[in-house]
Amino acid sequence: MKEITINIDKIKINDDWKEFLRDEFQKKYFLEIKKQYLNAINQNIIIYPPANLIFNAFNLCPLKEIKIVILGQDPYHQENQAMGLSFSVPKNVKIPPSLNNIFKELQNDLNITPAKSGDLSFWAKQGVLLLNSILSVEANKAASHSSWGWQEFSDAVIHKLSNEKSGLVFMLWGNYAKSKEILIDNTKHLILKAAHPSPLARTGFLGCKHFSKANEFLKKVGKIPIDWKIV
């Protein structure tokens, strides 16, 4: 069997992030992710998001512009939903319940009219890293790639951003996201925690005012606040 290696030049991620995460791409766990991915593709298993969107969160959010990290768990597993951005769905796709609650909170917090589109690309382009902890999923099988090793990669991203950047905002929604708090230096960054926006979660997300709190912090550290409208 041909040995699988990592050709960093072929990873579909922008050069700024490629250099920032170069060491991670060369680690054994990332090679294991690639093996699992290729095995699934060779078995004609459908994986979401499409290959060109797996690193979309990074490709839309320039490293030098990063201001906020919103951590999700894993991609949507139904057709035409996953686009490589946590909580986001493409234009003209029905808005999922969690994202509906996010839009409700935006209205409560900043009086922003709920959007008709669930595409959060505009946030990403302003410096919001919409990062899922797990970056791929098998069609119609939630959390099916949770054993692949993606968490090690996303944990490394969070930890490296915490160490090498300053004045970031980390939004941690739900117990899973809150467990990542240990990766973040709270003397350099603002950590905002709340319940998950899912309607199935206990109350605690609506009313958190994370969006206004994030912008107040960004202004305090001399950064341009985020325009949270969806365009």
Swiss-Prot record:
Domain of life: Bacteria
A matching Pfam family: UDG
Protein family per UniProt: Belongs to the uracil-DNA glycosylase (UDG) superfamily. UNG family.
Reactions catalysed according to its record: Hydrolyzes single-stranded DNA or mismatched double-stranded DNA and polynucleotides, releasing free uracil
Gene Ontology CC annotations of this record: cytoplasm
Compartments it resides in: Cytoplasm
Family matches, as HAMAP family: UDG (MF_00148)
GO biological process: base-excision repair, AP site formation via deaminated base removal
Entries under SMART domains matching the protein: UDG, UreE_C
Gene Ontology molecular function: uracil DNA N-glycosylase activity
Regions that span the bilayer: none
Active site, per annotation: D74
Keyword flag DNA damage: yes
Gene source species: Campylobacter jejuni subsp. doylei (strain ATCC BAA-1458 / RM4099 / 269.97)
Lineage, opening ranks: Bacteria, Pseudomonadati, Campylobacterota, Epsilonproteobacteria, Campylobacterales
Positions of disulphide bridges: none
Keywords assigned: Cytoplasm, DNA damage, DNA repair, Hydrolase
EC number: 3.2.2.27
Protein name: Uracil-DNA glycosylase
Function in brief: Excises uracil residues from the DNA which can arise as a result of misincorporation of dUMP residues by DNA polymerase or due to deamination of cytosine.
Alphabetized CDD domains for the sequence: UDG-F1-like
